[in-house]
Amino acid sequence: MEKKYVIILSEGKEYLCCHEDGCYYDVSCPMRSFTEGEEDFEIMDSGQNRHGKTYPYHKRKLKLVPGFYPNGWLALSLEVPKTGEAYTVLTVNLEDFPAFGIPDKAFVDINNNPEAMDFLIRYNLAEDTGYRRRNGCVEYPMVKLNLPELYRISPVSYTH
């Protein structure tokens, strides 16, 4: 059975949620749940008209494509809209263990894409957590991803 995702607004904050057994749970933190009649929340329109949206990056118009690394951690790539050709991957997978749910954290590949951090923050796709992890001679910044916005951009990416 395919999971159905919705965006929940609760106390001014949006959460990407999955619906199961009469309850909505946050995909990045399944212990956070919303039950109709018990909590005050609103199901938001996903605004899926963002699907073909492009972003300027390196003086090109590119499409953001969320995806997943083999261990379940989120990967953010940019591709050429007309051809679907991969342009670059904005994140790097530094996790050894499989993901639990859909993680709302990722490490930004500032080694190959020095502008990636500014790009993600500028377009409200992520925010800096302040945490850095060293791998080799590079300290990669961790970001908190805006999962509801990433879902709006590419709902099909979440059907894995």
Give short role names for the model-derived ranges.
Residues 111-155:
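Short, compact, well-ordered microdomains
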Residues 81-124:
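Acidic, aromatic-enriched beta-alpha/helix-loop junctions
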Residues 4-10:
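A short beta-strand micro-motif
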Residues 15-17:
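Short beta-strand-centered aromatic/proline hotspots
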Residues 55-58, 66-67, 72-74, 80-89, ...:
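Charged, low-complexity intrinsically disordered segments and flexible loops
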